[in-house]
Amino acid sequence: MIDVALCMLTLVPGGMGGSETYARELTRQLHGIPDLRAVAYVPRSAQGFSRGIPETVVNRIRGKSSTPERLRSVITATAFSRSIRQRMSGAAIVHYPFTVPAPRPSRHQSFIQTVLDVQHLDHPELFSGAELVYRKYFYDAPARRADLIITISEFAKQRIMHHLVIAPERITVAHLGVDRSQFVPNYGAREDFVLYPARSWPHKNHARLVKAMTLLRRERPSLRLVLTGGGLDALKGLPDWVERRGLIPADQLRSLYQRAAVMVFPSLYEGFGLPPLEAMASGCPVAASALGAIPEVCGDAAVLFDPRDPGAIAKGILQAIERGPVLSRTGGDQVAKFTWEHCRDLHVEAYREVIRRR
């Protein structure tokens, strides 16, 4: 029996994008695996996060999203590290799905770190000085010490190897997945709006998308833009044809995927990118960035464009509308390649590999 502690004390519910989907699904998929016993350790603010494996709540820690508040959570976890480690002492492996090893495992435990991407090293201009320092000490330095790193794309693996000089055999790639039972494809008529589900982080590239839509509306003046995700109030001066939905329930997002003319994904950088796959599972045509891991995820089932050029974004959206029926069919084939069960199996094999190396 392999005992694994999923230490998620830096979790901020509703504030961590696709990484939160990944970690939650991991708690579901690791339940009931023969010869594996996993327990999730979560902060008080995330009580009830686990969807399958047992959960232990650490009451002294409450996750928040700003850099100072995240640092405070790490300091708190470190201050109470003895008692937290005692609670996790039965685990042979401590796995940190949210990257930051807080608290560090004991010397008697193996240490696995999930590193979703190294965007801060590829694009430091998108981060504050404080955030870069935080990631240097709590992302990069621990990664060099980890027994194994799990990442979510070949693109991310190559960038981790490049920046952190880590041998390829110490990095496992586990593509994320989509639960197709949660998405009902619509291959029929669609409405006159473009959907972009993303938080207002700088690399999500909302400003260029609005410029692209302005160009596109010269040909299609009825076309609207619907934005979902957290922090959208930070986007100022949006035209009246842009609709800000903010954070919405999963069923509402699935409905938007079913009805949108196109799901656009103009991100400048992704370690993976779940929304294109979710859109494909809904039969929605996808126009997406040609940067980062996005081509690896989308394959030939999306129109790819240069996200740095508003004209290219506009052209990509228009092509996706025109090729809608074909993209709907090829998207279904593409999304079938990405399952949470396969993601789980690669994690389980990573755990077993770490035990074999001990």
Annotate each language-model stretch with its function.
Residues M1-R358:
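Carbohydrate transferase catalytic cores enriched for Leloir-type hexosyltransferases
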